[in-house]
Every structure is written in structure tokens, then in C-alpha cells.
Amino acid sequence: HCSVRRQRQMCIRDSSHMGVIFVSGAMARVWLNELLANDLSILDTGHSQYTFLLNDQGGVMDDLIVYRLGDETFLLVPNASGVDLVYETMVKQLPDSDVFLENRSGSVVSLAVQGRKSLALMERMNPKVKHLQKNELFVCEGDRDSMVIARTGYTGSDGFEIFTNIEQGKQIWEWLLKDHGSIQCSACGLGARDTLRIEAGYPLYGNELDSSMTPLQAGLGFFLKPSLKNELKAMNPERLPRIVYYQLLEKTPPPRSGYEIYEGDEKIGVVTSGCLSPLTGKGVGFALVQKEITLNDIGNYKLFVRNKK
């Protein structure tokens, strides 16, 4: 965690458990724009966007990143737990022609290179990365396979994600962990991924997002195309229950999923994600609340931690 946040450090994480689905064809963009929640019509080649696959009730089947690799080629990265459902849904809705799917989950290495020094070290591997802005990408064509490098991540810090074949992925992993002088690169795992995304205020499918929760209830309406956003508002005008982000004012044991939230003596919600921020030592996370609350209110709400408010 701290390797990502500190000035002269960075980390690398193996994200190859995530799904990898390629979509191509003359009608790929049009079809994906109908299938997914964000506005794909504004996504240019060499860019990426965060989006959702929704059910008929507006609930989130999965959240994913879409990378536009070319005019007619897209890379979709769903969660590991949702890749089968996402792919099955796509197959069921696939048109008869002009759109092609390739599920390469498990055969593509995905590496997350995150932290303040990630740009400096990635430049040594490929100087082209210095031209990438946030959410931009480029494709490196190789003799046997291509590699995608994107300036994306889910940590709240600067970083990159690499998609390549297994052999090349191993070589890149080993090179990044070598001694690079003033730049320190550490390996990190899913535990650090979780505390980093919580600290940054990023939701996780299965905790803050599920098939009964709309993006509006999760506070993620800005990732919806306007027409869909209006449709979801009409379906669920009250938007309750909903997800909120919290920060504890005092140092406590770590808040955990399932801990109860109170306003006075009234239980108003439960924690969906929580941890101690390694930077502040205080509890942060998300909660599912059942009533309207005053955001940024200080001292009016209590968290029940280990039988103590």
C-alpha cells in the first residue's frame, strides 16, 4: 500500500485473474454502446472508460473497463467473479454478423504498475508511455503477439496496466522488480489492492455493487449515458438504499463489512467495505444506508465497532 503512495516508490501486482474479452467487427462499437451503460460513442481509439453491464432492473451485473484498441477492436476487462456471466450475456445478445467475441481470460497476463514513480520506470521500458494521459493507451505490435499499455488503475495514484502474453508478462515482472537505483518497486497483492481502492473511494463489485444496486444508488451516475441515467431515475426516484463513503474521526480497530451505522439510537445502515488507512491510521470505507443523510456531517453518525460505538 505505502509503496504506491510514497514519493520514490511504486508497486507491481499480478491482475491476471481478471477477465479479458476481445470484441471486434464493423458493428462492435454500436453494439457495445447498446449493451453497456457508459457512452461508448465518445470513446476514441487509444482511450478507455469505466462502465457497467446492467440487468433489466438497472442493477449492476458487473463493472468493467473498456479499452478501444482500434476503430473496430475493443478489450473488455470484467471482474474475475463476473467474467462468465458477462461473456454469457454478451453471447446471448450477439448479433448475427459484424461483431466477434474472443474470451481470452486466463491466457493473457495483466500487470498493474502503480505508484508515484510508475511513469519514470515505465519510460525505461517503453519511452512512448510519457505521451499517455490518464485513461489513454497504445498497442505495441510484436513478432508473435501484441501488448497493450494503458495509463489506468484502481488505486487512486498514477499508474499503468499491461496486457500481454504469459512469456512476456513473466519477463516484464522480473525486470520491474530488479534494482533500478533510486526507484523502488515492490510486489503487492489483493490486500493492498483493497486498501488502496477503499482509501481512494473506489467501489468493489460484490461489496458496494451487485445486481440489486443501480449505479445511481452507488453514487456513480456520472458513468452513465444521459438517456440511461434519466431512465434509472424514473425507475427508482427515491434512490434508497444507497452507498456512501465514510471516514472515522477517531482511531479505532479496523471497520469491517457488516458493522452497523447509527444516527443516535437508530440503525441506518451497514458497512460494505472498511479498513484502516495506512496513511492516517483512521478507519475509512463504504456503507449502505437506508435513509437520507447529511453528507459531510461531522459527529452525527456512529459506527458500531466490536460492540462499541
Positions of the model-derived regions?
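Short, conserved phosphate/pyrophosphate- and ester-handling motifs at nucleotide-, phospho-/glycolipid
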Residues: 14, 25, 115
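Well-ordered mid-protein domain cores that form the structural environment of catalytic cofactors
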Residues: 39-93
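Short, basic and Ser/Thr-rich N-terminal targeting/leader segments
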Residues: 4, 15-17, 46-47, 59-62, ...
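Conserved, structured C-terminal
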Residues: 5-7, 69-309
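Internal amphipathic helical hairpin motif
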Residues: 26-60, 117-145
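Single conserved hydrophobic/aromatic residue that forms the stacking wall/gate
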Residues: 1-8, 12
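Conserved phosphate/anionic-ligand binding catalytic regions in large, soluble enzymes, centered on
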Residues: 13-21, 153-157
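Residue-level detector of beta-strand structural context in well-folded domains
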Residues: 19, 51, 64-65, 259, ...
